[in-house]
Amino acid sequence: MEMKVPNGLTLNDEWTPRNLMLQAFPEAVLPDHLQEDELPLSPVYKFVSRAMKLDRLLEVWIPHGANIVLTGENWSVMLKEYENDSWLTVGKTSKSSKTQESENFVCKSNHVRFKTDHLSTFKLIGKIDTSKSTFVFKRMKVVAFCSETRVGEDLVVRVYCFDDCEWSFERMMRTEQKTGGRLMSPIESVSFSVTSGKDVDISVKNLAGWQMKKASPLKFSYESLRNSFNVIPRCDLVFQNCRKTLSTSIFVEMVLNHEPSGETTIYASASLKKRILGDPLVRALDPEKVEE
């Protein structure tokens, strides 16, 4: 029997301990001295229960962000446990196989499985092969949001590039819910190369009736994407109306160039809130200058 618990984990067992709680937080909260060829593949997961030790093994599934399907031979996925103020490796895949199974550690295309008889703190780390001129990809997603905007105001588009796991998605959604964010685009996939050393540039196209006023920045930096489990990379684009007739909606095409895997295109749109009679801007405008 599978039981989904918050933050994307799955407990796969007919038996689960009572009063089980789960805390998930960025890797930076309990920092690890990662090597140059290592990067986080999950947040830190801490299991909390009244019972410190279990009376039987519990199977746990943790999602990871490595693109095993495309570049599994260049990834080594490690399961680490926090003990005595330090991180210890308790499970590891082989670089010679896309999936590595052992008695207590299994790595699949988008998650690992392991069994534990105690409740502790775990995370996943990816180690990449830098001895060859090869590309190693991480699975990510990109999406655009905006807040409620009135006709005649500048529109701020927030573009996120987040890890392809439930925890990152929920974390981003909580941020947007606090500011009344509105979804502008479908969620698209991005294969980010963790070995290219290149930023992911964003270009904006087909801005009918609008122009980009500023961007901070107009890219996702390489370092921010490598460490996206700590801070979700975000780009804020500000658009202003450039028509004599004010637009009541916006459509924008954004292209992410992520060499060497190619490009990802986002089509984002939103309707602007109409102003009511008595609004200072309405009084200042000729009614014919606002789109119906």
Predicted regions and their residues:
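Proteolytic cleavage junctions
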Residues: 1-292
